[in-house]
């Protein structure tokens, strides 16, 4: 008797990417249970290399391997930059991490940007006249 193929298990890949680091967390679809968590610092020794695209790619491959081992077939991606009164653009590792997750064999669902945006929050660093160089 032939087995019926299931739709597969989906998760959410939270990619936090700044200029100093990239953190990839894969959770279940509710976001409550963490399945895999890998950061740039777990891949390389030098602090200056944590935010590199290559490091993000290796971190994504490692996270994808752990997720596939635990039965995740596809992921929805949430990309986050530091946000607030810091940079609102993701770091160099975000694009590399998304590409690596796709190459690792995970199906990609939605990709959305969840960077926090201030609604007139705190004053940005640099004071009244800004940073004078």
Curated annotation (Swiss-Prot):
Keyword Ribonucleoprotein: yes
GO MF assignments: rRNA binding; structural constituent of ribosome
GO cellular component, one term: ribonucleoprotein complex
GO process annotations (BP): translation
Signal peptide positions (record): none
Region (Disordered): 114-133
Keywords: Ribonucleoprotein, Ribosomal protein, RNA-binding, rRNA-binding
NCBIfam families (UniProt xref): arch_S11P (TIGR03628), PRK09607.1 (NF007176)
Function, as annotated: Located on the platform of the 30S subunit.
Family affiliation: Belongs to the universal ribosomal protein uS11 family.
Subunit architecture: Part of the 30S ribosomal subunit.
Protein name (record): Small ribosomal subunit protein uS11
Gene: rps11
């Amino acid at each position: 008797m032939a087995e019926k193929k299931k739709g597969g298990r989906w998760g959410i890949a939270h990619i936090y990417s700044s200029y100093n680091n990239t953190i990839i967390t894969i959770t279940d679809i509710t976001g409550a249970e963490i399945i895999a968590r890998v950061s740039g610092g777990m891949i390389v020794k030098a602090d200056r290399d944590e935010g590199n695209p290559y490091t993000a790619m290796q971190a994504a491959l490692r996270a994808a391997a752990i997720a596939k081992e635990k039965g995740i077939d596809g992921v929805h991606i949430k990309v986050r930059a530091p946000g607030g009164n810091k940079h609102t653009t993701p770091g160099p590792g975000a694009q590399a991490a998304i590409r690596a997750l796709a190459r690792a064999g995970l199906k990609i669902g939605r990709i959305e940007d969840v960077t926090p945006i201030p609604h007139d929050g705190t004053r940005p660093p640099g004071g009244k006249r800004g940073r004078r160089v």
